[in-house]
Amino acid sequence: MQQDGSFSADARFDAVLVGAGIMSATLAALLHELDPGLRLLLVERLEGPARESSAANNNAGTGHAANCELNYTPMQADGTVATAKAVAINAGFERSLEFWGSLRERGELDTSSFLHQAAHISAVWTAENIAFLRQRFEQLSEIPAFAAMRWSEERTELTDWMPLVMAGRDLKQPVAATRIERGTDVDFGALTRAYLEPLQRSGALCVEYGTQVRDIKRLRRGDMTEADWRVILQGPSGKREVRAPFVFLGAGGGALPLLQRSGIPEADDFAGFPVSGLWLVCGDAQLAAKQRAKVYGKAAVGAPPMSVPHLDTRWIDGQRSLLFGPFAGFSSKFLKQGSLFDLPSSVRPTNLLPMLQVGATNIELVQYLINQLRQSPEERHDALQQFMPTARAEDWSLSVAGQRVQIIKRSKQGGRLQLGTEVVASMDGSLAALLGASPGASTAVTIMLEVLQRCFKQRLASAAWNERLQALLPSIGGDPVQDPALLLAMRQRSDALLDLQG
């Protein structure tokens, strides 16, 4: 605000993005590609980008394409598995690959910093779970997106696929696995930085780290019609105000409190349930080098999606690593570097009953979390040895993973725990927030396209934006789920541009 009471032009932006994680970074990249003239401001309360859930050691799963994550294909009462969610997630990840390929082709994105190939494997070792995996394989392999999936119960082949899982295993124990060679590991922290740094250097994006959103309110004109959003920031130089016609809340677990503060009625339907996580991290680089795959097992009954056990090859800050977990825990924080008061301060008259209803109807989840909290180091090591029989405790250390805030949504049937992510937007599209967790980052491009469709509908329909979007995403307008030829064309293009094999 200037001395004469008018608002300074340098404090007004076309969009304010809150949270310097993968979601805001993806939206910033898309908006800049569609209109390089937009003034964008990104605000982050920490001192750098991607330090919460987007960080590779915080993210519960990387490179999600539903190739190996068994929780996306639950068993149904009729003995078949549900495949719709897996197909949708796979299509979403293909969209991300398509976008990254376009940016790399333009020389705007170095994919070597965040994208690495690693086979995706599902492995199980009880008769019941083998029957489940076989049913999953038979159904998915009939779908074009998963046609390259391979099945094996042959020990020599399984040892080649996942040597650490098979070494030292009882020869009498039945083991089965499926494998997709064209899998990836994605360091979303590195990708976030790869998006943001060139935008910041060119002046296309203003970034303020160490800056917290204190308040967010809608301004009104003299005729009482709604105008810009007024965002109050607290940063190193004190408190200041910025304004924008559009605000995106992409602050991970911190999005819900900000959404509630905005006052939009759509926020009343939501509450959050935080789940924390722990990893066992291998400290032996030679051991980690023996595996180049993500090996997923089957989650325990009642376990949340982020707790599907896996022995996971990851590249963290350019270094190849091996992790096992995650083990679930509970903290009332909504962010890893949040406050213990996050959960209680999010309770409102509109969401208290749904929260209580979810607690009463998800006893298995509550019991699972209690059991996880009680786990001793020896019990965690026992869980690791189920995957890796030769694992030695001295080679592994415990590391705290990121926080996830699962959605609790009010409905006519009462409160329900909603897995996955959801875009919540004001009726006029001037504000949007992303709530929820898995698969999240891997489908960020698809999710941010939904934000554009709901909040920039008129501009997206313009010839200029339409032409630019078509150039970025050549398959846009088509449906790779229903059109195998389109899916094949997308994959051939992405594989060529991103150097993917299989």
Curated annotation (Swiss-Prot):
Descriptive protein name: Probable malate:quinone oxidoreductase
Taxonomic path: Bacteria, Bacillati, Cyanobacteriota, Cyanophyceae, Synechococcales
EC number: 1.1.5.4
Gene Ontology biological process terms, A to Z: tricarboxylic acid cycle
Family: Belongs to the MQO family.
Species the sequence originates in: Parasynechococcus marenigrum (strain WH8102)
GO MF annotation list: 2-hydroxyglutarate dehydrogenase activity; L-malate dehydrogenase (quinone) activity
InterPro entries in alphabetical order: FAD/NAD-bd_sf (IPR036188), MQO (IPR006231)
A UniProt-annotated Pfam family: Mqo
Enzyme class: oxidoreductase
